[in-house]
Amino acid sequence: MHEMSLCEGIRGIVEDQARRHGFATVKVLRLEIGRFAGVEKAALGFAFDVVMRGSAAEGARLEILELPGRALCYDCGEEAAIQDRFDPCPLCGGGRLMPVGGDEMRIKDMEVQ
């Protein structure tokens, strides 16, 4: 389950930010996760609760915001939102697409005290 290692990375970031900015508790942590990032949300939620024990984020509410998949179409030259990596271009129907977004994962923000 790679969600556990993702949460370990998040914990490291939270602990670093707590030291830098002097907060003791994270109330809410918001993640932006791309549609194609390959992250199982339920597994991430479980791993988050386990990995954050004993940290500033213990008991924090995890909010996941899904970012859309995006691709550049080589047929029409436009960038468009796609639901699946193998979808045709929604603008022209072309099949030559290069994904340009939707595989990212980042901490958007945290509510702290």
UniProtKB/Swiss-Prot annotation:
Pfam family name, one: HypA
Note whether Zinc occurs among the keywords.
Answer: yes
Q: Which residues of the sequence carry a binding annotation for Ni(2+)?
A: H2
Q: Which domain of life is it from?
A: Bacteria
* GO biological process terms, semicolon-separated: protein maturation; protein modification process
Quote the InterPro entries the UniProt record gives. Hydgase_Ni_incorp_HypA/HybF_CS, HypA/HybF
Q: List the Gene Ontology MF annotations in alphabetical order.
A: nickel cation binding; zinc ion binding
Keyword terms, alphabetized: Metal-binding, Nickel, Zinc
Signal sequence residues: none
The entry's Zn(2+)-binding residues are C73, C76, C89, C92
Q: Which PANTHER family match?
A: HYDROGENASE MATURATION FACTOR HYPA (PTHR34535:SF3)
The job of this chain, per UniProt, is described as: Involved in the maturation of [NiFe] hydrogenases. Required for nickel insertion into the metal center of the hydrogenase.
The record's similarity note reads:
Belongs to the HypA/HybF family.
Please give the name of this protein: Hydrogenase maturation factor HypA
User: What species is given as this protein's source?
Assistant: Cereibacter sphaeroides
- Lineage of the organism: Bacteria, Pseudomonadati, Pseudomonadota, Alphaproteobacteria, Rhodobacterales
